[in-house]
Amino acid sequence: METVYLDTETTGVSDDDEMVELTIIDDDGKPLINTLIKPKYHTSWPGAQRVHGISPIDVRHAPTQDRISNDIRKVVKGKRVVIYNAPFDSKFLPELEDAA
């Protein structure tokens, strides 16, 4: 079974926060998805911005998660998904429910 590796950056650590960046790479380190994401509801995230450096200006023209949802599903379908900080990151990715 192929393995992909996933990491996110978010607007914060609460359940109502959103992704601002998603990276999925393969075993060779090749990026399969590497994109900024424009949040639907959050317009600023100063605390998280201090951690990851991604500002609202950086994501103003980025796709929303809804727009890349099918791409995420295609990349993870049938693959083992290794997630950095899985308990946290997976709550931002309902697309993973269909992965196996």
Segments from the language model and where they lie:
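Conserved non-catalytic scaffold segment of RNase H-like nuclease domains
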Residues: 1-97
